[in-house]
Amino acid sequence: MSDAEDSDSIVNEFVTAIVRESDKFAKVHSYPMQYGTGGYRADAELLSSVAFRTGVIASFLSAKLHGQPVGLMVTASHNASSENGLKIVNILSSLDSSKWEAYLDQVVNADSADELTVCLTSILKKAKIIPGSEARVFVGYDSRSTSEILAQAVIDGIVVCKAKYENFGLLTTPQLHYMVKASQTYGTPDAIGEPTERGYFEKLSKAYQSLMTGKKIKGTVLIDAANGVGAAKIKELAKYIDPKLFPIEIVNDNIDNPELLNNSCGADFVRTQQKPPNGISAPKHARCASFDGDADRIVYFAFGSHSFHLLDGDKICALFAQFLIDLIRSTGLDLQVGIVQTAYANGASTAFFQKTLKVPVLCVSPGLKHLYHAAQAYDVGVFFEANGHGTILVSHAALSKIISHEVLSPAQFNALKTLKTVFELINQTDGDAITNLLLVEVILAHKNCTLKEWNQLYSEIPSRLIRCEVEDRSIYTTTDAEQKLVTPEGLQEKIDALVAKYTGGRAFVRSSGTEDAVRVYAEASSRGESEDLALRIVELLH
């Protein structure tokens, strides 16, 4: 037998074992699933085969990366508790993501054993993966009733590939991102911490306490944890921090009843409904924050005398950017700060960055991989989506400058120490509601700033975001960072004609990356006009 024939035989035997095992996880979804910005999302009852097959591809990915760990998170984030999802963590951004997402879709949607065999064999050969190569997958899941079951299907997919796995159990999505990155870099100059939950909590608590020692804390922070995994993890973190430095009260923390997850609470509810979550009452101007179901998004809010004030991802981004620019200036360092947003960013925030802070702003398509990639263009990239998902990215070049920088005064020394510790506090691997909460609290304490003062950085242009169910979201294709429709043909021209009738009008339509729907976003000079513009665009979709 020739080497080629021997290789084919090994591949065939390997694939046959996978396909045979896959029979235990019958494909029940009748429509083509597509790996979107949030991975796969669907009714949980449809995801057993998807979980198994995604576990297989995660193993392939790790083998392609010479055994580097790949994360696989079971979560549907802010979606309803009856839904679930699967997302590969930390890796697709470093490879040709569109190619591997296409591989995933082919495998997940294969209808027969023969089709699955052809798909798997083709991927192994195209990617030049040798069956049985070293591979390792980290698995985590949220608090949904179906998550642990789906995680076991993932693990079965990993095991049949003869890959190693580590089941971290209940985690926030950002924690799994941290575990993967920490494991990849542990023991190297790029190490971010110990690749364990304890390592994560110790890293955050040490940095936070260092930054808050001697600072005045203004009252308790009320945290709406969306009845999700973030409730358990913020409570665990609090054990590592002096309670005088971290006065918190947690509501919507019932993770033992999965049906309550994201039910009239959580960051997505608060932002889209523009009202406080159930279960929370607070004094006027008290600091309140909402996480989403897997704790990668955060928004702040407060009760005014006669109104509700929302401080979304745009406002958090503004707070972070202003603080970092002032801090970097105080160190004497020459570092470029840049902002990355999506089309959902309020137009007033973009103007604040460009005209007040005088920093460059990039607009990219929604989704972590797009924001993360764009932020790498700067020494310090601050990227946020309006929904509260974002973080700060620091380049290797910037870190080298910080390490070698010679200070000329005690003030520069203190500023440099603070800057280094801020970069220790943030989770550069993913938007993280917990670390972003900590940094907001640090900045407000350092600036001796109230929520009301923070909210006055700029005044939002009135906007309206509407979720609209449609028969087929795939017909809505876009260009220009998803701000303009290409298809259905002629629809963009109709939207442009409507927008032109409104003072300060701006609007766009894009299909959701996480739900079977499209989203309509509109801005105009008044609340009523933005609402009217959005509703009139919705009429065009039906």
Curated annotation (Swiss-Prot):
Protein name: Phosphoacetylglucosamine mutase 2
Active site, UniProt feature: S77 (phosphoserine intermediate)
Domain of life of the source: Eukaryota
Cofactor: Mg(2+)
Catalytic reaction equation(s): N-acetyl-alpha-D-glucosamine 1-phosphate = N-acetyl-D-glucosamine 6-phosphate
Cell compartments where the protein resides: Cytoplasm; Nucleus
Gene Ontology molecular function terms on file: metal ion binding; phosphoacetylglucosamine mutase activity
GO biological process: carbohydrate metabolic process; cell wall organization; chitin biosynthetic process; UDP-N-acetylglucosamine biosynthetic process
Chain residues that bind substrate: E385, A386, N387, R510, S511, S512, G513, T514, R519
